[in-house]
């Protein structure tokens, strides 16, 4: 029996290059860099003093003061994009069965700022534990889908996925599977992250994961460039309304794309480094193509994980060449992170949205900040450097990989 088909009928975005879905697309096509000096805290003594922050975000535009105190930023971001996606899908204008609507949400870390501030307050005291009663519920990753379901009365499957930078891609994959199996008709899937904190920046600096290009933050995220020196930390959220195809047709919903294939694998190699030959990445892309019943020649665009790290970019390009063989030279490749920075657990959702917008607008967003060719990367690959490229896109493959060796891959197609 063929599984139930799953389509995307609504989207929402809150990113360092745009605070709404249309603004995000404008930022992508304009080749906007979201990086700049950190304003969230005094980073003057930090090894890295810049990040990709959301600009102009005021929580009081979305929440009451009481809610702002009770919700960590990552949960606020989740509610903001869920609202945009639900409105975009016109769920409020349709008669739907809320028992068949679920929320599955990815976050690699969750309420990091809440955890950090509570522990700092305790350490500065006399040893008496005086913790905020909302400390635990503000911090846990699953509070984001919980709050979304509470706000909208969705009674279907509700949980968080935690797989580092692959978290929201896993949320989309789980959402698709719940619809395929008939547990749900609609899943609000996505991810959010707010890691630009003292602890977040210090922790990633201690790993030597971040770029330290403090003299030129705008160009610091430079995937596939010879002189890349680490990723740029970002923050934000993305939401997608996943819906069973016949259900969407029956309510005359706008359909952006179909999710045709999914893949999962593990490197089983190292805590943070990818396998140097990209073995896990090779496996996950092959699994995804098999699930979609597509050939490599059917793919028009690959949205790379492309973090701007020395090891990661080389391993991923090796894997893509191994999977796609000669077909790799007929498609476009890009890295959204060159503009948004690395949104960690929100990356998969935001980059999935980027793929869908690229298909709907027949335009490939660029990989910005390329200055010098890396001799370890095939110069014949079309990495969409510097400028967007007009292209008819019928199928887009999106890679998302996480610390721990978690690999997730999703193929979006036009109907």
Where are these regions (language model features)?
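Conserved beta-ketoacyl condensing-enzyme motif
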Residues: 8, 25, 32-163, 192-201, ...
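Conserved small-residue
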Residues: 10, 28, 82, 103, ...
């Amino acid at each position: 029996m063929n599984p139930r088909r799953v389509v995307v009928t609504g989207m929402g975005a809150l990113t360092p290059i745009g605070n709404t879905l249309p603004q995000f697309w404008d930022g992508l096509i304009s080749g906007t860099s979201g990086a700049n000096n950190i304003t969230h805290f005094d980073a003057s003594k930090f090894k890295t003093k810049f990040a990709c922050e959301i600009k102009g975000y005021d929580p009081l535009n979305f929440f009451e003061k009481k809610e702002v105190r009770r919700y960590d930023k990552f949960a606020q971001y989740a509610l903001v994009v869920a609202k945009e996606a639900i409105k975009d899908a016109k769920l409020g204008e349709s008669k739907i069965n809320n028992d068949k609507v679920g929320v599955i949400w990815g976050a690699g870390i969750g309420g990091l700022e809440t955890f950090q501030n509570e522990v700092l307050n305790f350490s500065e005291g006399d040893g008496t534990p005086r913790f905020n009663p909302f400390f635990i519920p503000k911090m846990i990753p699953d509070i984001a889908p919980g709050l979304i379901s509470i706000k909208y009365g969705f009674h279907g499957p509700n949980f968080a996925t935690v797989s580092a930078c692959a978290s929201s891609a896993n949320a989309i994959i789980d959402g698709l599977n719940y619809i395929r199996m008939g547990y749900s008709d609609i899943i609000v899937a996505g991810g959010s992250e707010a890691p630009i904190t003292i602890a977040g920046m210090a922790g990633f600096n201690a790993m030597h994961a971040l770029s330290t290009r403090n003299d030129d933050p705008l160009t610091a995220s430079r995937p596939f460039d010879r002189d890349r020196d680490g990723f740029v930390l970002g923050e934000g959220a993305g939401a997608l309304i996943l819906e069973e195809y016949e259900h969407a047709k029956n309510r005359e919903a706008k359909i952006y794309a179909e999710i045709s294939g999914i893949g999962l694998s593990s490197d089983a190699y190292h805590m943070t480094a990818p396998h140097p030959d990209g073995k896990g990445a090779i496996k996950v892309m092959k699994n995804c193509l098999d699930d979609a019943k597509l050939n490599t020649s059917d793919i028009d665009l690959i949205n790379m994980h492309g973090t701007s790290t020395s090891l990661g970019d080389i391993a991923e390009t090796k894997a893509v060449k191994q999977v796609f063989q000669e077909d790799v030279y007929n498609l476009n490749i890009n890295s959204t992170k060159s503009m948004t920075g690395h949104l960690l657990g929100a990356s998969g959702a935001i980059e999935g949205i980027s793929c869908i917008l690229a298909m709907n607008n027949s335009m490939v967003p660029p990989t910005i900040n390329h200055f010098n060719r890396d001799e370890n990367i095939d110069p014949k690959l079309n990495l969409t450097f510097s400028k967007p490229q007009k292209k008819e896109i019928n199928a887009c493959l999106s890679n998302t990989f996480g610390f721990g060796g978690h690999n997730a891959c999703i193929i979006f197609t036009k109907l």
